[in-house]
């Protein structure tokens, strides 16, 4: 089975793979975060259960296509991250997707509980998960990219400034109650 899809390019740095197109609204947050830092990504829908051979081939060929890490999002019996990690030496970051009868707890545990030797870094359920997956990938890339590291430093500073403004606002409202 050939690993071919529109918009695949050797120039992409991060692979984003989701088990279903219904995951895209959540996973797009990872893509948007990467794009905001100027990191290019390829995006695919590949099912660990319905297209296992394609998942394995995708992972086996990822490094040769220039990818530096893979972000894998799946819900339910979320084996996508594990299948990809079993077939590559690239870092794999798993995003468990909430849904179904267990509201994502099954996906969280399936992504998190990998056997020794097949690591999948796992992020949170919900909207923080894809953002943190992208930021984790960016942090890995920034180890050898000073410009990207500077963007991360600016991002962290902006987060701190946002908290300081929120603190000042709440304190002003609290003072008015006294």
Task: Go through the PLM ranges and name each one.
Residues 1-10:
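N-terminal amphipathic/basic-hydrophobic helices that include classical n-h-c signal peptides
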Residues 12, 39-42, 89-90, 113-123:
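Glycine/charged-rich beta-loop-alpha catalytic/anionic-binding loops adjacent to active sites
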Residues 12-50:
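Glycine-rich phosphate/diphosphate-binding loop of Rossmann-like nucleotide-binding domains
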Residues 18-25, 29, 105-178:
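C-terminal binding/interaction regions
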Residues 23-27, 51-55, 74-83, 102-105, ...:
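Short glycine/serine/threonine-rich phosphate/pyrophosphate-binding segments
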Residues 25, 41-43, 53, 76, ...:
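Acidic, glycine/proline-rich low-complexity segments that act as flexible tails and inter-domain linkers
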Residues 43-64:
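N-terminal beta-loop-helix "entrance" segment that forms/cooperates
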Residues 58-100:
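Glycine-rich phosphate-binding loop
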């Amino acid at each position: 089975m050939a690993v071919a899809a529109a918009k695949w390019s050797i120039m992409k740095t991060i692979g984003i793979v989701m088990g279903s197109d219904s995951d895209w609204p959540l996973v797009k947050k990872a893509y948007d975060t990467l794009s905001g830092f100027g990191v290019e990504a390829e995006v695919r829908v590949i099912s660990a259960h319905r297209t296992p051979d394609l998942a394995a081939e995708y992972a086996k060929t990822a490094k040769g296509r220039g990818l530096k890490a893979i972000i894998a999002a799946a819900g339910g019996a979320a084996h996508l991250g594990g299948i990809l990690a079993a077939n590559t030496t690239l870092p794999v970051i798993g995003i468990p997707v909430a849904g179904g009868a267990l509201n994502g707890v099954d996906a969280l545990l399936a992504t998190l509980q990998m056997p020794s030797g097949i690591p999948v870094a796992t992020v949170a359920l919900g909207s923080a998960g894809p953002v943190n997956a992208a930021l984790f990938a960016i942090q890995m890339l920034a180890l050898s990219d000073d410009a990207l590291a500077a963007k991360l430093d600016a991002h962290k500073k902006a987060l701190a400034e946002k908290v300081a403004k929120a603190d000042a606002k709440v304190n002003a409202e609290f003072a008015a109650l006294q």
